[in-house]
Regions:
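Extracytoplasmic cell-surface/polysaccharide-interacting catalytic and binding patches
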Residues: 2, 22-241
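Sec-dependent N-terminal signal peptides of Gram-positive bacterial secreted proteins and lipoproteins
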Residues: 2-26
Length: 241
């Protein structure tokens, strides 16, 4: 799944996935609107590698990357742009967005998936520049601390794993908390786990996840783990303890 994990634990998890990448479970008791045959094996993976924890305390290195990337179909991405994810996660993401569309939430598309280390560095620096322009009386460290509440340093972003995606509405192409006002959000909160995804940064869990609330950010962990996380109302950090 991944080319060069930095930490030994991550390397072991990656090897587990390479040895067994086929789905090993059953689909949940949920009435899917779409044909799930093309997606079942992706959703039901049980490999621990899909539960890799990447955050401020568990960084990965500059050369850490998915071994296999697949593109999300362009009709499911914002403006048809190229968005890639780890191949199994990409299939699960496709299933989730197609289900959203089948249920009438046709404005929801994927705007971001895999990001490499270098891209995250550019993104972080851009945010830092924005904060410095917004707060000219702040020190660089103050601006940096502000950015760290909503953006990861390169190596600390789980976007680098290829296992997460950012969703957006074509009617409001700004990634902010107003995504929670979209009717699709309530459906996602209650049903994303049926496609192996969790809301990665829930409201009120900043102290646990290290990041502010992101109603648009969904992480693939497989149906089994996602369902347990959903039912317990916990974060990925709490689940992998």
């Amino acid at each position: 799944m991944f080319k060069k994990p930095v930490k030994t634990a991550l390397a072991a998890l990656s090897l587990t996935l390479l040895l067994s990448s086929c789905g090993g479970g059953s689909l949940p008791n949920y009435e899917y609107e779409i044909d799930m045959k093309p997606y079942k094996n992706a959703l039901t993976v049980t490999d621990q590698a899909y539960r890799i924890l990447v955050n401020k305390e568990n960084p990965c290195g500059a050369d850490y990357a998915p071994e296999s990337l697949s593109a999300i179909p362009s009709e499911l991405t914002l403006y048809g742009k190229s968005v890639q994810m780890e191949s199994t996660a990409a299939l699960a993401a496709e299933a989730l967005v197609r289900e959203l569309h089948a249920r009438g939430y046709t404005d929801i598309v994927v705007t971001s998936g895999y990001r490499d280390y270098a891209y995250q560095q550019v993104l972080f620096n851009t945010y830092l520049g924005n904060e410095q322009a917004k707060h000219p009386d702040w020190t660089t460290e103050q601006c940096r601390a502000e950015v760290l509440t909503y953006s990861a340093l390169p190596g600390e972003s789980e976007h680098q794993t290829g296992l997460c995606m950012d969703l957006i509405s074509t009617g409001n192409v700004t990634l902010d908390v107003t995504f929670a006002d979209n009717p699709a959000y309530a459906w996602l909160v209650d049903n994303a786990h049926n496609f192996g995804f969790i809301l990665r940064y829930p409201e009120g869990e900043e102290g646990t996840t290290g990041y502010s609330y992101e109603p648009w950010h969904y992480r693939f962990v497989g149906v089994d783990a996602a369902t347990k996380i959903y039912k317990k109302g916990i974060t990925l950090e709490e689940y992998v303890k």
